[in-house]
Amino acid sequence: NSGGVLVSVAAFKNHEGYNSKTMVNDIAVIRLSSSLTTSSTIKTIGLATAAPANGAAATVSGWGTTSSGGSIPSQLRYVDVKIVGRTQCASSTYGYGSEIKASMICAYTVGKDSCQGDSGGPLVSGGRLVGVVSWGYGCAAVNYPGVYADVAALRSWVVSAANSV
């Protein structure tokens, strides 16, 4: 509720291959109307060049609800999760199967997840942006990891779009 910086968006670019039915390429780039000054609460982050290993520690943050149908929090929240590799996420261990595509990465820890309102937020692992909150079945549903746009897989598009938006 306090201490933040409000900056308007000057322009944005959605991935041309985004599909709202399959959620493939669920990523966009924004250009702010003014520059941000780095500080103790505003920092830059590098883009992942490779997907983190299955089981790697990660953190997702956002302003979303803390449960399905819940209310929006007054403070930025975060939760620690573990990376679930694409092959494992699409396996029979979890409930998604073929819905998991090459432009997606998953993260799961029992009882912890991103939720409504977190979409577009960061998934960070190893000090790099590895994912962008995309979709999932409910929030923290058993055997349904959170699904994220895979930054490493989409990195070349992000870099190109950032230079042209």
UniProtKB/Swiss-Prot annotation:
It is found in: Secreted, Extracellular space. Keywords: Disulfide bond, Hydrolase, Protease, Secreted, Serine protease. The active site is at D26 (charge relay system), S119 (charge relay system). PROSITE patterns: TRYPSIN_DOM, TRYPSIN_SER. The record marks D113 as: Required for specificity. It comes from the Eukaryota. GO terms for cellular component: extracellular region. Its EC number is 3.4.21.4. One of its GO terms (molecular function) is serine-type endopeptidase activity. Its main location: secreted. The keyword Hydrolase applies. The keyword Iron does not apply. Residues 1-163 form the Peptidase S1 domain. InterPro entries: Peptidase_S1 (IPR050430), Peptidase_S1_PA (IPR009003), Peptidase_S1_PA_chymotrypsin (IPR043504), Peptidase_S1A (IPR001314), Trypsin_dom (IPR001254), TRYPSIN_SER (IPR033116). This is Trypsin alpha-3. It comes from Lucilia cuprina.
